Amino acid sequence: MLQQVNGHSLGSDAEGRASLKGDLREFLGGEIPLHQLDDLTKVNPVTLETVLRCLQARYTEDIFYTNAGCTLVALNPFKHVPQLYAPELMQEYHAAPQPQKLKPHIFTVGEQTYRNVKSLIEPVNQSIVVSGESGAGKTWTSRCLMKFYAVVAASPTSCENHKIAERIEQRILNSNPVMEAFGNACTLRNSNSSRFGKFIQLQLNRAQQMTGAAVQTYLLEKTRVACQASSERNFHIFYQICKGATKDERLQWHLPEGTAFSWLPNPESSLEEDCFEVTREAMLHLGIDTPTQNNIFKVLAGLLHLGNVHFVDSEDEALPCQVMDDTKVSVRTSALLLQLPEKMLLESMQIRTIKAGKQQQVFQKPCSRAECDTRRDCLAKLIYARLFDWLVSVINSSICADSKSWTAFIGLLDVYGFESFPNNSLEQLCINYANEKLQQHFVAHYLRAQQEEYEVEGLEWSFVNYQDNQTCLDLLEGSPISICSLINEECRLNRPSSAAQLQTRIESTLAGRPCLGHNKLSREPSFVVVHFAGPVRYHTAGLVEKNKDPVPPELTELLQQSQDPLLTMLFPANPEEKTQEELSGQSRAPALTVVSKFKASLEQLLQVLHNTTPHYIRCIKPNSQSQPQTFLQEEVLNQLEACGLVETIHISAAGFPIRVSHQNFIERYKLLRRLGPRMSSGLGGLEPAEGSSEQPLCAKEATLQPLLQDILHALPALIQTAATPSDPAKNTQIPLYCGRTKIFMTDSMLELLECGRAQMLEQCARCIQCGWRRHRLQKQEKQRRAAVLIQAAFRSWLTRKHIRRLHIAATVIKHAWHKWRIRMACLASKELDGMEEKPMPQAPGTLRSSMSPAHTRFLGAIIHLWPLGLVLANSADGVRGFQRKLVAHACLRLPSDRPSNKVQTPQQDQAGITSIRALPQGSIKFHCRKSPLQYADICPDPSASCVTGFNQILLESHRPVQV
């Protein structure tokens, strides 16, 4: 320990302890607000100890998530916290305008990736890398993120689409319990440890709705089926079928209660993962029907009985090993469940078939006891590995969407954490190698690449040292010689190789490598690799055999003869297919080893991650006993050192995680130019964020495009608008830096720009809507005016047409009236003045001869409608008294072609007056007698309303007189 404080050496250990206690009390006095620090970049000073204190203070307050710049630190609570993952909380983070301002949570990372896919300048797929030691909570974190995306990425409009989306989401969520049941197991460090790696692609369409998913798995630990370490368990599914099967199923699968199985250690322990009904229901939702499920569980029960088969050496070495008497029942039961011939099953494990020579002559050799056990284990591992791969393919076919229906994806990487056990073999070597590659991806993407980019873009940056694991990767996978290459070479040499020989070769060939060590106290052959998370000792015993992963052809041929429908599907009998050994024997091509295949799949995964925008979640395990409310500083400190969290905090506190090219920045945020005036001079008082250069915001403003300058000039107005009294920092600093080709900014600045852009888009949309409404109203007004004009013109035309018709009718009536008046006047004067003692019909006859029948009928119809006063007014002026009435009567009885309109002649009316003469001037003496005329005795009534007298005579005059 360095005994120096403020430049003064401490005189004694007592003074040092006193000073340390004083500093500790001072630190503890300020520990109260530590749990309120949501971001470790705000810790001052940023050291490993202060970060550790802050995490411990938050863990004590049941705050399990803390930001560390671009990384989220997640502490495993080792207890259920239902309110921390409630659906209401998911909706709260999804609906928040700025989720970064809420409490740190995995939902913040999930929402950030979802919004990046939704509104990213350059549409790039997103990925979330969940890393940490075994038991740190990676699987739980991935499961909660999948539930979060299932909630927020489902917003279809129609009811039918909503049902389809719900079905897809349910299938995606149901894939978790199935894969955990068949791929997870209880280990020394974790009760639900993932024994395989998986990368889940959540597929989104253009509307950011989840349309499907795809699962890719890596390196299933199939050796766990036949070999479990002390105090560990087999895969969960074996315990589920033994504990959850019904009585009928137990009889069908030959699993009586209390039966002990060699491959089922620690069956008395009860875990939450041993829920058989959840697994069966999830399989049913994924399209695996009940008969197929029963077939799967029957095969698994056959594997358990196969594990109870044990061999003993034969007395005669020329004879194969014999099965123990107490395990013969297990052979029979296993053959029955797998639907294999019992004899062939035993022979495939007891006898080895060898093909030699050019003619491929077949020889049979009895196997030793160890070889029989190895072939038995190989048969079980082969069946379980094929079954697991088939389940993954069924899950993908059930949840994967068509490639044309999705445009982007969010990847969730959940791999096994760093492992170090008392006995580490090839599985732990591959697992830790994968963690080294992921650590290098984080270092290369964030720690190294970000700082190098700052320097290239012209930012005045103080380089932060970090722990690089490239030397360890060179030891593991370097070219031309590395640990993996040496192990693969031992497999290709096809010679007996002992564990000590492999150890000697590794130590001698790779001597001098800084990350290679040796435990001199160990009696077993082994070598030590110093990983980024700590040194791990690997035993070389069985390392080469596991890397070869040989499958005897007899076992494959045996399984192809099974009558079980599932095994027939997993091992199709294809005569054209040749085994790996046959192909390698004929072509002499090197066989693919476990390390080679795993390395290839890992490179493919890293290439996918390289093409996405990564987000990191560091899961920390507070204690190795998985106890709640227990924070062991030493264990947490080792994990913080291993993952380089302090370096991450340093770079995040002073850096700009968001980088956008000038062109993309202009294309997306050119709307913000309207917020501020356009200027051609400097940017005034704008300064970069803390930790960057002291120069103005844009050091090379002359080379920038005018649009970019206008946008940068508008930023102060945008920040001033968003500033609040409680957040005065926004009034003084702009967390944005303009590099040579890119714009660098913080997450808060990006959120601010997006809010300003959304407001401008809203204003533009409002202007467009107003203009459209104005145009639509103006168009409607023009249409209304045109319609009114057309209606007025049409009504005017109709009116003129009607008036024209009335005018024509009036003209006709007027002409007819004038003709009638003239003729009546002429007729009356002739009758009165020049036609003495002439019969009255002459006038009608003359009129009839001068008028056409049509005019006569027309005038008759009109005259019959005339009132009597009009007739009398148009009669001769010299006629008075009774003669005037007779003239009127004669006028009304016009000539007509109808018989009823004929005027009686004087000969027909001899009893009345026979002529009308001009009265002589002077006194006249009338000699009266009783008149023979009809109605002569009726006196006209002067009342106009009474139809009596002469009016009655006139009305009835058209009727013929009955003689």
From Swiss-Prot:
Domain Myosin motor: 35-758
Subcellular location: Mitochondrion outer membrane; Cytoplasm, Cytoskeleton
CDD domains: IQCD (cd23767), MYSc_Myo19 (cd14880)
GO biological process: mitochondrion migration along actin filament; mitocytosis; regulation of cytokinesis; regulation of mitochondrial fission
GO function terms (MF aspect): actin binding; ATP binding; ATP hydrolysis activity; myosin light chain binding; plus-end directed microfilament motor activity
Topology of this chain in the membrane: Peripheral membrane protein
SUPFAM superfamilies, per the entry: P-loop containing nucleoside triphosphate hydrolases
Origin superkingdom: Eukaryota
Positions bound to ATP: 132-139
UniProt region (MyMOMA region), positions on chain: 829-963
UniProt entry keywords in alphabetical sequence: Actin-binding, ATP-binding, Cytoplasm, Cytoskeleton, Membrane, Mitochondrion, Mitochondrion outer membrane, Motor protein, Myosin, Nucleotide-binding, Repeat
GO CC terms in record: cytosol; mitochondrial outer membrane; mitochondrion; myosin complex
Chain ranges of the IQ domain: 762-782, 783-812
Broad class of the protein's primary localization: mitochondrion
Region entry Actin-binding, spans: 602-624
Function of the protein: Actin-based motor molecule with ATPase activity that localizes to the mitochondrion outer membrane. Motor protein that moves towards the plus-end of actin filaments. Required for mitochondrial inheritance during mitosis. May be involved in mitochondrial transport or positioning.
Cross-referenced PANTHER family: MYOSIN, UNCONVENTIONAL MYOSIN-XIX
Family classification: Belongs to the TRAFAC class myosin-kinesin ATPase superfamily. Myosin family.
Record note on domains: The MyMOMA (MYO19-specific mitochondrial outer membrane-association) region mediates association with the mitochondrion outer membrane via electrostatic interaction.
Subunit: Myosin is a hexamer of 2 heavy chains and 4 light chains: interacts with myosin light chains MYL9 and MYL12B.
Record protein name field: Unconventional myosin-XIX
